[in-house]
Amino acid sequence: MKKKYFGTDGIRGKVGDFPITPDFFLRLGYAVGKVLLASDRQLAADKRPTVLIGKDTRISGYMLESALEAGFSAAGVDVLLSGPLPTPAVAYLVRALRIQAGAVISASHNPFDDNGIKFFSSAGSKLPDSMELQIEAELDQPMKTTPSIKLGRVQRLRDAAGRYIEFCKSTFPNQLDLRGLRIVVDCANGADYHIAGHVMHELGADVITTHASPDGFNINYECGATHIETLQGSILQHKADIGIAVDGDGDRVLMVSREGVLYDGDSLAYIIAKHRQQLGELQGGVAGTLMTNLAVEQAFERLGIPFARANVGDRYVSELLQQNDWYLGAENSGHIICRDKHTTGDGIISALQVLYALRDTGLTLADFMRDVPFFPQRLINVKVSGNFDFRSNPAVAACKNEAEQALGNDGRILLRASGTEPLIRVMVEGKVLQQTDYWAEKIAETIRQQAASSMTGS
């Protein structure tokens, strides 16, 4: 059954436009609460379920948080409020506190005027499709506030950030530290603003923290993992050894070398996997996505490490890991899942696993990646309006087929609709940069023209 509200990463949209409104979040909190009450058989009859609500630093988070907590309370569910906190911190605390669910109000890497919400189960993992469908069914039912004696209580969780900082540090080996390492940490003016730099500092690094002054409007603005050029400039300015950039909700990470070279999620997962293989600690294979560079897949093959591709989206990477009983997966955008360390993608913990590899071996990022000659890969995001279906458009199909014939076996083409924004993503990969750029531009322009024609009816 197709879902009405939930996409690949929860619910997301423009603040003030349905469904990112206080009214909807009130009803959503109530609906989730009713599903929790009906499904949790382990609670005693006189106990209420508890939900932890976290958020990033968007100005709209306060408004939506208030509506959501009211909905939970009306359903008879207790609420803990953490304040601004990274998405993976909420996933961790749900497990650590042994409560029934977590909610994160965030639009991740999107601009400040977007927002959204994602939920975590008591196991700290994304909700299954079946539960999201139950929630959507409950949303169609009228609200009926529980009797006053059964209303949920709301309180603030003290030291949520401190608990999470200690958890992050626990994933780094006790026998190593980061002394002598100068690190620039770009916090994207997001949920990691009061956490990421502290983790690195407490492990001994000389830390320069940038974009750690959120004002409600500057999240992801020309900073963080979506604007890596800012970190590249900071690295050179501060003569740092390495740079770390997270996104607005802290679930993805990119890294930059002292020379200013970018290392994406593909590269970082390869470094972690190669190091674990050297230690004899790699369990199973590695999960990537349809976007993973072909050179990385070939490099894993040379190392004898099994590799498989999931659809784009960290929930699909996580599902593939669980199916194969593997423990490491990544997207090139920087979502990296180390299942032996955490249940979800975590920017800080992923960066620590890379730093572990560097400190343990004495190698640099470049040293680890020397045997991976990346294929040129061009990604173009094409904005579209309405419900343009590129899959059934003959002109788009013809252009794609022409490109595939030109690239042959040395290239890949991927067209997909974004699950969170009105975009069609065009990815072309090949051995020759000029040819890769040419076909990416041509396919993107064909989509633009066909989408415009479909809107005008011509």
Curated annotation (Swiss-Prot):
PTM text: Activated by phosphorylation.
Sequence positions bearing Phosphoserine: 108
Binding residues for Mg(2+): 108, 247, 249, 251
Cofactor(s), names only, from the UniProt record: Mg(2+)
Record keywords, A-Z: Isomerase, Magnesium, Metal-binding, Phosphoprotein
EC number: 5.4.2.10
Annotated SUPFAM superfamilies: Phosphoglucomutase, C-terminal domain (SSF55957), Phosphoglucomutase, first 3 domains (SSF53738)
Provenance organism: Nitrosomonas europaea (strain ATCC 19718 / CIP 103999 / KCTC 2705 / NBRC 14298)
Gene name per UniProt: glmM
Species classification: Bacteria, Pseudomonadati, Pseudomonadota, Betaproteobacteria, Nitrosomonadales
InterPro entries the UniProt entry points to: A-D-PHexomutase_a/b/a-I, A-D-PHexomutase_a/b/a-I/II/III, A-D-PHexomutase_a/b/a-II, A-D-PHexomutase_a/b/a-III, A-D-PHexomutase_C, A-D-PHexomutase_C_sf, Alpha-D-phosphohexomutase_SF, GlmM_bact
A molecular function (GO) term: phosphoglucosamine mutase activity
Alphabetized Gene3D superfamilies for the sequence: Alpha-D-Glucose-1,6-Bisphosphate, subunit A, domain 3, Alpha-D-phosphohexomutase, C-terminal domain
The protein's name in its UniProt record: Phosphoglucosamine mutase
Active site per UniProt: 108 (phosphoserine intermediate)
Chain's role: Catalyzes the conversion of glucosamine-6-phosphate to glucosamine-1-phosphate.
Stated family: Belongs to the phosphohexose mutase family.
Note on how the cofactor is bound: Binds 1 Mg(2+) ion per subunit.
Any one GO cellular component localisation term in the record: cytosol
Biological processes annotated in GO: carbohydrate metabolic process; peptidoglycan biosynthetic process; UDP-N-acetylglucosamine biosynthetic process
